[in-house]
Every structure is written in C-alpha cells, then in structure tokens.
From Swiss-Prot:
It comes from the Bacteria. The keyword rRNA-binding does not apply. Contains a C-terminal catalytic domain, and an N-terminal region which modulates catalytic activity. Belongs to the CheB family. The keyword Hydrolase applies. The lineage of its organism: Bacteria, Pseudomonadati, Pseudomonadota, Alphaproteobacteria, Rhodospirillales. One of its GO terms (molecular function) is phosphorelay response regulator activity. Residues 14-132 form the Response regulatory domain. One of its GO terms (cellular component) is cytoplasm. This is Protein-glutamate methylesterase/protein-glutamine glutaminase 1. Residues 188-381 form the CheB-type methylesterase domain. Its EC number is 3.1.1.61, 3.5.1.44. Residues 143-173 are annotated as: Disordered. Keywords: Chemotaxis, Cytoplasm, Hydrolase, Phosphoprotein.
Amino acid sequence: MAIDSPSPATDSIRVMLVDDSAVVRGLVTRILEGEAGIQVVASVGNGQMALASLERNEIDVVILDIEMPVMDGLTALPKLLQIDPGLKVIMQSTLTLKGADVSLRAMQMGAADYIPKPTSTRDLAGGVDFKSELVTKIRALGQARRAGARPARPGGPPATRPVIASTSPRTPVPIHPPGPLQLRSNTPEPPDIIAIGSSTGGPQALFTVLGTMKAGTVRQPIVITQHMPATFTTILAEHIGRVSGWEAREAQDGEAIRGGRVYIAPGDFHMVVETKGTDKVLRLNKNPPENFCRPAVDPMLRSIAAAYGKRVLACILTGMGADGMKGGQAVVASGGTVIAQDEASSVVWGMPGAAATAGICSAVLPLPEIAPWIMKLAARR
C-alpha cells in the first residue's frame, strides 16, 4: 500500500521510502520521525508506485531498495531521475558482493549514495550505527538538494528551497563549509604519485575521472581512499578497472607501489605509505578512525607528503565532512599540490569545500575538467 503524508513544513527534508517490506518501511519511518527537519512524505512498496508518488509529491531524498516485485530499484532509478533530475537517491543494499556490485552500478546510473541494509529487523530497529548513518546521509543530501533550484517540472516554474540550518547531533562535521574560495598562486610540481580522496558521490566521480584518465595516459601510481565498508571497496576496484583499463585493486599490506596501477584503501583499514629502502610501500592499519572514518583520507595524505615531499598531487572529490583538508595541509607544507572538485558538480561539497576554503588548493574544477588537469601536470614528469 502506498502512503502519502500531509505536506510537511517547507523547511523539512522530504523523504520517500521504497521497500517491498512494510515492516522495514515502518521501522525506518519511526527512526526518521524522531529527527527534527526530516519528514517521510511517501512510503511505497515498489518502483512503479514510487514513480506515481513522485509525480504527486515534492521529494528531496529517496531511500530505494534494490530487490522488489513489479519494478525493482535499478529499473526505477533512471525513471525517477528522468522525472526529477535533481532528486537524491540513496540505494539500500546488503553487505554482500552482489549487493555491493548492484549498488555501484546504481551509482554509475546516478544514485547519490548507498546505505548498508541491516541483516535483520532487530538490527534495523536497534542499530545505532544504521540510524546515525542514515540520518547523516539524508541531512547531507537534503542540504545539497536545497542549495540549488529544484529542476522545473511540466506545468510550473522551478521552486527554490531554503538551505536547512539544522544538523543532526550525530553529524560530526559541517556538511557545507563556510568561507570564500581561496586559491594558491603556486606553480604545481609534476607528481610522482597521485592521491584521491572521496566520500558521498565519490564512486561516480571516480568513474568519471579514471574513465577519462585511461590506463597508459599517466605513468604515476594512483592511490585512492573512498569512504566505504569492506566488500564494497573490493567491488569498487573491479568497477574502476572495467571503466578505465587500469590495473586496479585493493591495497595489500606491505606491497611496493608501482607506476601505472591504482590502489584502493580496503574497507575498515587506513592506507598509508612508508619508505622501505628504495621502495615506497603501502601499509594497512586499524588505527582509530579519523573524521569518524576508517579508511580516512587524512592519514593517507599525511604519509604520502612525508614519503614523497613536493612530488605529490592530491585531489579531493565530492563528500560530506572535511576529511582530506588537514592531510592536504600536510601536502602543501611539503611543497605538493592539492586540487578539489567544485561545488556545482559535487553531490555534497563538504570535503572539497573544506579544502577549497582553507586556501590549500591550486585549482577547484568541475568534475569533467579534473582528469585533463591531472594528465597535463603528470605528463611534465
């Protein structure tokens, strides 16, 4: 049964739940009802019902299950985005290889993010981690949605929404950093290594950057920290390999870094670089989370700055929070270069915005311009 709620206050983030389990929808609704500034305005059991509900309601964020009768999540996703291109869709997926693969395919198709689905309704009802992650992502994506104009629909002009001022008490850092853009006026050094950090919206940004920067276009190794759990990072490496032709894989502890390869931090491990004789090697550790994340971008960048000095190019892509900003400061202090994705092309301009407004970036670029910028600088080495 489809449920449409009365129109909420205009400053609420409007959420639609799409899941064939009425029990799951009910539990998630109860979680969100206790959060100020969030309201579930529709709750439906399959993709076809979601399309009909989207035509009737103004929605900011959709929580979309993958496996459903009548119309599944992957089939519904492009249809939802066709109706409302600015819609933020969070895929709900199991922590399995199949679930990770489908979630990453969905992000290639335009989904903004994913959330691991608890394995039982008991975990769903009582899981503090699930609630915290869900609410944080809804707030981040809802705010990103409101930061610009809602795309026009047939029969009416576009409607702008106010930026949401309230944040969840569990949200660890500001979603959108304050302050003006501040660019460095330095001459970037050609790099010996390229480091990329990303979070919310990161997989599709990585596919764009690496898909443009095909294997063989640069000789330098590429190291990536994307905020993701184990299993998902395994599949991320496979997807990057397919779209780019690079030899891409999860990093292994102690392996020497080689040019022309892509190394991805495994879920639940920080990835850092150490010097061992004449080699640079990757080390994995379970040191405490930084910026509430493991893997985190900051420890990766700090270690690379220490190992490579000025021959580092760090790129901060879309993501909530400020992970990568302090690590970027270490890169700049060692003479290296930092660039970031611009606000207009970011799903959430938290991480790149923090770097851009901290005065450490040599360039802040639209997503399609990042790979050409990297390739031009890398070719000088």
